[in-house]
Amino acid sequence: MDKHFIVIAEAGDFIGEQKLIAQHLNGEMRDGKWHMADGTVWEIIVTGVGAINVMKTLQDIPRNAQIINIGYAGSANYEIGSVVCVQEAKLNHPCVSYLEPELLLKNVPSAWLKSPAECLTSVCYSNTDFVLQSDYKDCVFDMELAYIAALGFENLVAVKIVSDNLSLHDYREVAAGVE
């Protein structure tokens, strides 16, 4: 039997991230699991925020498991509420330059999304802290995806919802449902 996991990094309560799953993925929540419209059942894994939580939580998950990482992300120029299907994960190192491994992700199957036409494609930069400024445009910033990808999952896709334009205040309002 294939393993299917939706990975979220909820800092507070699970409701905000669960809302994202219901708003953007085809299916429904039943018995604490996500039932995709195609009949697959997805276990929800809450990692917590940041690299160490990701590694501790996901270390024993089979590398051939199907993983959907869904969550909030900041962006310098995408509108709040934009849906981004991530094609590549990178670490955010604005002050250093060295060759990093390519962390390419699979394409998000359009059948999994409620509104696939709305999904922008982009790079996601993972940072160890909230990003408040950046010269990078047409991308998103989170605190987990590059670390999830670096663990070597073969079937990883990611959907990010822009919560802020590099503003901690905006992020907190959107995450709390004050849109």
Where is each model-derived feature located?
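Short, Lys/Arg-enriched, disordered terminal segments
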Residues: M1-K3, D38
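N-terminal beta1-alpha1 ligand-phosphate binding loop
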Residues: H4-G27
